Amino acid sequence: MLTSLVGSEMCIRDSSNAITVSSVTSISMDPPSLLVCINKNSRIHNSLTVGSKFCINLLNKDQEDLSNICSDDDKYDQRFNDKNWNLDDVPFLANAQSNIFCSIENVTSFHTHSIIVGLVEDSKYKNEIKTLTYVDGEYS
């Protein structure tokens, strides 16, 4: 799974961030909300402020390479090279399985990570389900 984010001060491509996360959890349907945990040492962390926007992009099986790029700090500059990124506002991957657009409602610190609570504002999805999964250290 991949999340991309634009903080309140980040509106251009050079300020955009993307990171692969291993888990996104739904919290509630009323209001629709989810959480994601981000390591405090990651580059994206300091952009995660209340009121900023992000998008959870659930990847397709054929997007394993992009997932690996977004999890490798040595490939940081390659994260937005894919032609399917839409960078107009909150960056999202147009050909992902689904996109879940959120605004940050709460950020809670817990040891090495921050727990980010996002309120879902919009979503898009493909009808054909071919979602990339990561289980027991392997993609499937």
Show the residue positions of the predicted features.
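Single conserved hydrophobic/aromatic residue that forms the stacking wall/gate
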Residues: 1-12
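Short beta-strand/strand-turn micro-motif
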Residues: 14-22, 99-102, 118
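A residue-level detector for short acidic-glycine micro-motifs
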Residues: 23-26, 104-106, 122
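Short structured motifs
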Residues: 48, 84-88, 102-103
